[in-house]
Amino acid sequence: MLTILIFVTIGTPITSSTARACDESIELPKTTSFVEDVQPIFEAACIACHGPLRQESEYRLDVREVALSGGASSAPNIIPHNAVDSPLMHFVSGQVDGMLMPSKGKPLSDQQLAVIRKWIDQGAPWPDSANGVIVDKGEWWSLKPLILPHVPEQTGAHHPIDAFVRAKLDEQGLLPAPPADRITLIRRLSFDLIGLPPTPEEIDTFVADPDTAAYQRLVDRLLASPRYGERWARHWMDAAHFAETHGHDQDRIRENAWPYRDYLIEAFNDDTPFNRFVREQVAADVLAADSPNKIAALGFLAAGPWDESTLRDIREDTIDREIGRYVDRDDMLTNVMSNFTSLTVHCARCHDHKFDPIPQADYYALQAVFAGVERANRSYDPDVTVLKLREALRKRAEQLTAPDTQLRQELLGTKSQQLVAEWEASSERHLTVWQSLENATAESTGGSTLTALPDGSFLASGARPELDTYVIAGRSKLTSVTGIRLEVLADPSLPNSGPGRQNNGNLHLSEIEVTLGSDKIVPIARAAADFDQAEWEIVRAIDGKPETAWGIYPKVGLPHEAIFEFAEPAQIPTDGKVIVRLKQLHGTGHLIGRPRISLSSDKPPLAPDNLPTEVTAILAMEPAARSEEQRLTLAVYVERERVTRALRALPTPKLVYAATADFEPEGSLKPPPGPRPIHLLARGDIRSPTELAVPGALACVDALPARFELEAGLQESARRAELAKWLTDARNPLTWRSIVNRIWHHHFSRGIVDTVNDFGRLGSKPSHPELLDWLAADFRDSGQSIKALHRKIVTSETYRQASHVGECWCDGQRGARSDHAHRVDTDNRLLWRMHRTRLDAECVRDAMLATSGQLDLHMGGMSDRQFDLKPGRHVTPIIDYAMFDLDGPAGQRRSVYRFLFRTLPDPFMEALDCPAGDQITPARTNSVTVQQVLAMWNDSLVLKQAEHLAVRLRLERNTTRDRVSLAVRLAVGREPNAAELDGFSKYADDYGLPNFCRVLFNTNEFMFID
């Protein structure tokens, strides 16, 4: 054992045949720095066995006190100013027989030994900033096993939450505030659960209902409202730092980010159990495979900013690109671990966490979980029936490519041949006749291998160059040609069955050129295709621009065809020579996998979906004269046409911007072939990789394994699935404490733990630890219903307290009691009253729209771009919020449907502390600033809604006093008192009803919840 030997050797000179003397010729700096010179040696050679994860002989070289003292023996191992007698030097230089450290790997070099020796002789200075911390994970509250605590017995407390809260109040000699009045309660509850003010009718009904169950019915009604999902999805969007642009210097719009928002709204409205909610957002493609519409949940992993210039625009093999990937994965893992475990795992990126038991190895184990995904548009079928049908049809199409014995028998059978006869006799036969090239050959200028197949097509294989041009040459017996047909055929040897060679099956045809017996290119007047990828239409293959092209994504795995009609019939020379060049210049391997060329002399217009030459030849024969192979060819064609039509009839797959390993490449961003190797980086430096990371999670959760056991060759999604299971394991105490604290925070404006996303030593401790554990354990063990958790919280007397203390409190002893409470618990951590809080930006905007009668409750779909948009000088567009038509349809929906622009946020919403999505925001700032006052008084949105409210008041009431009374009821939920009615009416008469409405929107009662 290392420490025993150290103890023995103290003060005793030891010699060994393996010992290395000091090489005085080595040049060293005048002063040796621990951080710059010594610590990197320890991290590279020693920390694996003597660090936070493993401490052989209880010795550590990352904690100063242990490094100096010598571990278990407590005998000094590093003697400052005396390297000769320091046992550490004896071991690393081989001065102990049979004991040369490190025991694994290369011995330290003479240079490294000289550095350590000089550092010790200088006094072994070790700054506090570089000193590790010994953390006993079992002692820290958030890592302790989650066990349901006993509910304390409290007189008058009929609810578990009240029992826990009042026990704490009793300890400090405090009393709870009296209940809030019913108007305050319904307004508080309505904004909390659905983010909208109650209507006067709803208030009247609740206030007048004498039934003690009236409050419970109100809670149930609000939780059942579709508005609930909209309100609570917005909270989660803050936490996930969701926005609809990339951010950074190239703030490109994400056209398909919004399905994730709609997923959240649906998940909250459906009360998705929390374990499933977590699993869907981390690994829906594996753990919710029976519900393909849940693929949109993977938008969570891609919700944050993305550096386009680094991850798309620069070369794959650069250091900057590799750094960008590590940073991108850092955002993904931070999003997951901060929001589901409330730990700052990202602080272990460059070194072991300084305060929490999270070693750097755990951080990179989580990096390895996301090593196989990128952020991109991911296609999916939301309908499981459509998905299964698409899969079955693709499988059938693949089988038809090379029919086996059983399929041959089926196709030559009576039923199949009857279908052929019916098809042949039908009037739906295609009219254009196409003839394949004879004696055709194909060459690739880029290095692809093009193999001729019996059907006249060429199958590409072998090398897949970035760019390529296929030169297909042949002869034709036609004398005049009106157009050319390019078929791009599916094949099981191609990615996703093709028809392209890109990993996702796509292709990009940049230009097509046809020459007939000379070098003169035949002009093409018109092009048509059976399918065009958005923004990659077939006309782009004849526009003369190499940067544009025809594509077919997401309809991959299908044959496609394009028709190119000549400007006028072209004469074929006597030798019949035809040359077609298929230029594929977009890059990233967007190459055609199996092309086939045919010609027609029919009169224009020519149309896609016409008969192949071999089928035309067979149809010219009498059925009785056809051979078995010809009958099979015809049956295969008819069945393939049926399958192709069925596939084309299916809805186009939807797209969501999400984590994916299969997507349409952009620039240098391509689907990864598999999970990339992840190495621990010494000090977080990409140039200093050390050991290979194994996918896993956190070792500090004792009940669960820290590394995942995965078979070799599994898809990257298996890693995410294991992480999702780790997160939702009942033995993981972090997940359940985190979510109940998060929900509590949004009801009380602060969590039981103030730092919602930091349950570590730099975060705050819980104000009511037993209550937190009771809520978490009960939530975990009772179905994990978030709606049930809401119900439990808002039905407590603690939630229903008044936010301010009136004269009636404690039998008129208001002064002494409240002064004592403010003195003992100034910031109300013990909840002796309810918190008063300002409405968030969305609630302010939505409340104005609801009050004015302009709110549109249409749900879902693409986000509302409440700005004027023009192209910018570079990627980021020019945004002008002032030019937006506030009365247009895009200006009336709830704020959760606003388009969120990262670098160019809405100034009005920003003034009210609405986050821009650039950072994870578990808790918003709740400020009161001059900017807010100016925004609420001058912004065009406020002015417009004040005008609309005035119009509503004029329509619904006839006198100024009645209009003022209704306005106050709509805005703050109560009748004005006599003085208010007189003053407001005079103001409305003097300055106009719109100005009075404007004032009303600026009152504290409108802006705050009591």
List the model feature ranges, each with a label.
Residues 62-66, 125, 129-150, 255-257, ...:
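Primarily the internal scaffold of c-type cytochrome electron-transfer domains
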